[in-house]
Amino acid sequence: WGWLLLITSLTHVTHITQWLALVRLADQLRYASWYAFLLFLLHAHRSFKDNRNFVGLIVLAVSLTAWGLVALGLDVLGMGAWDQLSRGILFNAMAMPILAMVLLEQVFRNATKDSLWNIKPLCFGLAGTYVFDLYLFSQAVLFNRLDEEALSVRGIVHAAMMPLLLP
């Protein structure tokens, strides 16, 4: 993802801009999938079955994903002021790893003692990717642009964390 985003940010070809939109769409769907998986793990625990906080986490995950998809759609269609739209996209990109880390923390906190050692590699792997994404997108929000060097190693960081996710 990082190399494709770097190539699309350095070139101004319109069909590559469409690839950039597809990459951002894939990133949104990846986060939505991890949200669904982590919420499924949380729902399996007794402490979250009849809890209003769990419903709040679901609403937050759905709204963040929808916000990102709407902003992406507006960007692709060319609607809205670019400055406001790009800020919205960057804030959404920064908020998504934050929510993912909150969900991951809740999964780890509510794990039983028997399953704690089984869930630690998952938590380390996902936390590594989310911390790097938070670094990348918080810097982008501060400076209103993505750092090309950090973006180019994003794929390497995500690939380095994958062995922790595999059984």
What name fits each language-model region?
Residues 1-101, 122-134, 149-166:
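Individual alpha-helical transmembrane segments in multi-pass integral membrane proteins
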Residues 10-14, 105-111, 141-142:
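Secondary-structure edge/capping motif, primarily at the C-terminal ends of alpha-helices
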Residues 108-120:
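Hydrophobic, small-residue-rich membrane helices and short re-entrant helix-turn-helix hairpins
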Residues 136-141, 145:
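Phosphate-binding active sites in nucleotide-utilizing proteins
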